[in-house]
Amino acid sequence: MKIGAALEFNLIDYPGKIAAVAFTPGCNYLCPHCHAAPLLANAKDIGDEGFFKYLDTARDWVNGVVICGGEPTLQPELVPFIERVRERNLSVKLDTNGSHPDVLARLLEAKLVDYVAMDVKGPRFLWPATAGGEGHEENMTESLKLVSRFPDYEFRTTVAPVIRGGGEINFITVHEMAAAAKLIAAATGRSDHKYFVQKFVPRKDGLLDRRLETFPETPPQLLADVHKEVSKHLPNTQIRG
């Protein structure tokens, strides 16, 4: 499987685990606030053999692997890669944008993934702006249902700036975030999901749309207001960041 970058040691991305992280190159979205812009070109590939060699030397402390990107479900060798990870008795967490429910269904049926984190790009009517394109709406909705069937999972949305018609840029609103929460509850028929509303943090070297590099981070009061409103629909909502 193509790996664009890797981390040997991570205590944040996989709750309760000491994890190695594999970043896959390439993505079918163009989210303006994406922090992984260098991975999107799908050009760099450091290969996976070095990653597995590291796992074999780190058995005493690493007990999980995070596969993120980019978008991992674009990788044709994702399933064999995960099978090799599982052979080492390691837990697997997958980060996804939900655009390939067929891959998620295969992973679910084979019981290959322990934890899935799915990015929800706000309410459906904003997806063309927040995901940078159209055409994935039905797939993303189907993936909401599938992800909620994994052994452990979370949904998450970054309270990020949205580039609107005419080039106006402002943060996703409380109303729009509430609509995203309603979408999750309606698609899955449940409201007991872990849902994280995440702070947007600008950076100078990696955002896909450079206009956001100087945009402020999400105000604490907006995060608090979003949390209060979204919790009416998804009570297990938490602020992250």
Predicted ranges, named:
Residues A5, F9, Y14-E49:
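Canonical Radical SAM [4Fe-4S] cluster-binding loop centered on the CxxxCxxC motif
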Residues A6, Q198-F200, I239-G241:
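Conserved beta-strand termini and adjacent loop/short-helix elements that scaffold enzyme active sites
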Residues A36-A43, N63-E71:
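Glycine-rich phosphate-binding "P-loop"
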Residues M1-I3:
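Extreme N-terminal starter segment of soluble prokaryotic enzymes
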Residues L7, A19-A20, F215, H233-L234, ...:
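Class I S-adenosyl-L-methionine
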